């Protein structure tokens, strides 16, 4: 009789555990979907809250789902301009898997925003963007020849970093413009326009350079 009673209790307990797990899974998924929707609509504060709620339901366990939620949270923080908080998460993720390209890229982007160019470069990803940021600082400091040299290095190191190549090309045109060689700058920026389509600042620079032809 006692054995039968124990069996019934165990079965009931197993059923309760299964129901609890199903409830947790359902709510984790709901929070994840809410977070992604907020991320898409640029409501970053609410996205972060939703991802935190999803993570909280895991009770400290860090698996694939939790790592993905942390990654989304870091993305929301990065987009909102909270680079230090995003950096802390990417550091944590990277420490667990240093071969993960997504973690390395996110970490490198945060390091660029926090000014640690050397460490960003050491990660070996988005090299074009790293050198472009260095060149931009050199341009802002009036060191145009140094910037052009950095840009050439960036092109050689960019690899598959097409975003970096685009940024390098634009900054190359700006450096030549500031050196006073409007013809060279226009030539580069027109090539940029053909490949990437000049918009925003690039479109304004292109229009300006076209008005400067004949003044060099």
Residue positions per predicted region:
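Short coil turns that delineate tetratricopeptide repeat
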Residues: 59, 64, 98, 125, ...
């Amino acid at each position: 009789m006692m054995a039968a009673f124990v069996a019934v209790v165990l079965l009931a307990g197993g059923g309760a555990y299964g129901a609890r797990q199903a409830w947790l899974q359902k709510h984790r998924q709901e929070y994840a979907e809410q977070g992604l929707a907020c991320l898409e609509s640029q409501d970053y504060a609410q996205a972060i809250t939703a991802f935190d709620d999803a993570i909280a339901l895991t009770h400290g366990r860090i698996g694939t789902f939790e790592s993905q939620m942390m990654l989304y949270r870091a993305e929301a923080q990065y987009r909102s301009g909270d680079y230090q908080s995003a950096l802390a998460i990417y550091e944590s993720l990277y420490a667990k898997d240093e071969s993960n390209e997504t973690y390395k890229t996110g970490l490198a982007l945060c390091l660029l925003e926090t000014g640690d160019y050397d460490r960003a470069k050491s990660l070996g990803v988005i090299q074009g963007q790293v050198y472009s940021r260095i060149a931009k600082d050199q341009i802002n400091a009036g060191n145009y020849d140094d910037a052009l040299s950095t840009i050439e290095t960036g092109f050689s190191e960019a690899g598959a970093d097409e975003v970096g190549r685009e940024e390098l090309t634009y900054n190359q045109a700006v450096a030549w413009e500031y050196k006073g060689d409007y013809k060279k700058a226009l030539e580069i920026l027109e090539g940029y326009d053909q490949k990437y389509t000049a918009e925003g600042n690039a479109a304004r620079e292109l229009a300006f350079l076209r008005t400067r032809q004949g003044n060099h």
